[in-house]
């Protein structure tokens, strides 16, 4: 410690003439080491200014620039052997050099958490100090700035609106980087490997809100800005490899952070503190399927060591130490999630009014609601009574107070087609005490659809007019076609009026009198002709006495000699060439 005090005294005496406004070397292109969300930019170490002693002279060792960027316990692949690191707390030291180190260490810790870039100058400065750089001394403003930084560090670790534990008992920040100066964890060395950097969130205390911390921080910011003149001086932090004897020299790598950058970082910190609760709430709402995410919202518990819940919420996790061992039923998980959501909303002062009671599960509805059949339902509970599928926005049918999807309703309750036995979904034809699809109701004989004339039924089947009369209507005795309208009944047969005529000459019968021969109607002439009862002489029917000769029939007065025309009433005649002759005429003509 004596060597350290001597070293700090030398540093203060040799840097007393340096201006509080060093040159900002922003034009040099730095290169950086990516470390997660942080970027540290490292530049070659500038040569020592001639008046102050060099780093080698003070420490007696030669430092390799690459070794200077190997912080113990950091996330880089090559690690330095563990060595005791300086411990910085939020309490002020007596000496001004210690105050400077504490204040700068706290500022580096806060700035590192806010994900800003630290720049190191990469330009070889000349041995002669620039006129614009030189000034009388750091003065009282630098000491005032150190004091404000110490107070800011104390406020950040123990804000007035939230109770804070002492540095020795508080749990470590999750994933704090060892190159950043922080508070040791229960006397544990800071050389261990740390996790990823996570923003520190204040603890909740009862019903106090996050806005309770704003007045003190904003007043500190106003005091900080008023105490630092413009242009704002950069705070130079000598960062190098830490060994047992602490070595801090002006020739090592320098880190500068302006007051405007610190103000911007604190504004972003306050914005994140104000929003972290709503982000945690949204993450639980988005995790509506807890069995898929593996973290049910209801399993949120506080750490037994009193860990800050906000730190876990920043990583998108709840405060439970491990995921659940098994999966419960989706219904119980949904109920647990809704109950947790309701309680969280009540804690935030958000009044939620149930939109009704579900008609299936009889529980209040807090999210989407389906209104149907005079009731309210959870969307997942409004299902088809038969297939149990969610109806959603599809059409449904109600029967006996129960909802059915369109498919099951038609399958169960719709009328069936007599032809195909399928359910009738749209238009229906009712005929012959049965129901039919319109496209399946057609003539049983020809398959034609029925027109305006309708159909005729025979033996339980439907026929068109033509096929029905062709198959089942009475047939005409004359033309053998169906009789559709008027008809004549004669000879035990039905006849079309135009078909009831003489079957020989097709002459209609006068006064309805006709002669029947072999079941067919004839006129008188053709009737006697068919029977052979016509007079061979006059070709008229014989109604009375007749003479039969030469296989013919004659009226008595018409049976005469073919030459002299005398009546052959005696019954004697001569026949020649199918003609009758008397005896005398026959002798004269043929003898």
Swiss-Prot record:
GO-annotated molecular function: BH4 domain binding; MAP-kinase scaffold activity; metal ion binding; neuropilin binding; signaling receptor complex adaptor activity
PTM summary: Phosphorylated by MAPK1/ERK2. Phosphorylated on tyrosine residues during integrin-mediated cell adhesion, embryonic development, fibroblast transformation and following stimulation of cells by mitogens. Phosphorylation at Ser-244 by CDK5 reduces its interaction with PTK2/FAK1 in matrix-cell focal adhesions (MCFA) during oligodendrocytes (OLs) differentiation. Phosphorylation at Tyr-31 and Tyr-118 by PTK6 promote the activation of RAC1 via CRK/CrKII, thereby promoting migration and invasion. Phosphorylation at Ser-250 by SLK is required for PXN redistribution and cell motility.
Subcellular localization, as worded in the UniProt entry: Cytoplasm, Cytoskeleton; Cell junction, Focal adhesion; Cytoplasm, Cell cortex
Region (Required for binding to PARVA and ILK): 262-315
GO cellular component: cell cortex; cell leading edge; cytoskeleton; focal adhesion; lamellipodium
Low complexity: bias regions: 89-99, 315-334
Disordered as annotated region, ranges: 17-139, 156-261, 289-338
Motif LD motif 3, residue numbers: 216-228
Annotated positions of the Phosphotyrosine modification: 31, 88, 118, 181
PANTHER family named in the record: PAXILLIN, PAXILLIN-RELATED
Protein's UniProt name: Paxillin
Source organism of the structure: Mus musculus (Mouse)
Gene that this sequence comes from: Pxn
């Amino acid at each position: 410690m004596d060597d350290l005090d001597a070293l700090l005294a030398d540093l203060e005496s040799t840097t007393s003439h340096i201006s509080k406004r060093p040159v900002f070397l922003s034009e040099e292109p730095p290169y950086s080491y990516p470390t997660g969300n942080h970027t540290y930019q490292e530049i070659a170490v500038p040569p020592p200014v001639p008046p102050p002693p060099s780093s080698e002279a003070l420490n007696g060792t030669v430092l390799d620039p690459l070794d200077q960027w190997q912080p113990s316990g950091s996330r880089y692949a090559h690690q330095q052997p563990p060595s005791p690191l300086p411990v910085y707390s939020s309490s002020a030291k007596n000496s001004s050099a210690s105050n400077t180190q504490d204040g700068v260490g706290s500022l580096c810790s806060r700035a590192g958490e806010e994900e800003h870039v630290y720049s190191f100058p990469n330009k070889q400065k000349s041995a002669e100090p620039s006129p614009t750089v030189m000034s009388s001394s750091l003065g009282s403003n630098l000491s005032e700035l150190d004091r404000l930084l110490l107070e800011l560090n104390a406020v950040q670790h123990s804000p007035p609106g939230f109770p804070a534990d002492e540095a020795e008992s508080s749990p470590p920040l999750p994933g704090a980087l060892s190159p950043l100066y922080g508070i040791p964890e229960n006397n544990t060395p800071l050389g261990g490997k740390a996790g990823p950097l996570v923003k520190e969130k204040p603890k909740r205390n009862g019903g106090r809100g996050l806005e309770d911390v704003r007045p003190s921080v904003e007043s500190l910011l106003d005091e900080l800005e008023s105490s630092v003149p413009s242009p704002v001086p950069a705070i130079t932090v000598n960062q190098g490899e830490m060994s047992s004897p602490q070595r801090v020299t002006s020739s090592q790598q320098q880190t500068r952070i302006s007051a405007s950058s610190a103000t911007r970082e604190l504004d972003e910190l306050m914005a994140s503190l104000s929003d972290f609760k709503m982000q945690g709430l949204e993450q639980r709402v988005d995790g509506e399927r807890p069995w898929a995410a593996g973290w049910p919202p209801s399993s949120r518990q506080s750490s037994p060591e009193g860990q800050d819940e906000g730190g876990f919420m920043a990583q998108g996790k709840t405060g439970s130490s491990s995921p659940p061992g098994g999966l419960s039923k989706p219904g119980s998980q949904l109920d647990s999630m809704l109950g947790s959501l309701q309680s969280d909303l009540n804690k935030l002062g958000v009044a939620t009014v149930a939109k009704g009671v579900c008609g299936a599960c009889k529980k209040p509805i807090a999210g989407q609601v389906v209104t149907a059949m005079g009731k309210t339902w959870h969307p997942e509970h409004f299902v088809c009574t038969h297939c149990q599928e969610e109806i959603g926005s599809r059409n449904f049918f109600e029967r006996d107070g129960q909802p059915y999807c369109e498919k099951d309703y038609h399958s169960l309750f719709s009328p069936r087609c007599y032809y195909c036995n399928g359910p009738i979904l749209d238009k229906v034809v009712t005929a012959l005490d049965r129901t039919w699809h319109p496209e399946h109701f057609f003539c049983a004989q020809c398959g034609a659809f029925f027109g305006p004339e309708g159909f005729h039924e025979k033996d339980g089947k439907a026929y068109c007019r033509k096929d029905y009369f062709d198959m089942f209507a009475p047939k005409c005795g004359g033309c053998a076609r169906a009789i559709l309208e008027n008809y004549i009944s004669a000879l035990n047969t039905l006849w079309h009026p135009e078909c009831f005529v003489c079957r020989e000459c097709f002459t209609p019968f006068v006064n309805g009198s006709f002669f029947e021969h072999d079941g067919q109607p004839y006129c008188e002439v053709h009737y006697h002709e068919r029977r052979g009862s016509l007079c061979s002489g006059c070709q008229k029917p014989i109604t009375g006495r007749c003479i039969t000769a030469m296989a013919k029939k004659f009226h008595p007065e018409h049976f005469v000699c073919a030459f002299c025309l005398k009546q052959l009433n005696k019954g004697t005649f001569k026949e020649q060439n199918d003609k009758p002759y008397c005896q005398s005429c026959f002798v004269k003509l043929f003898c």
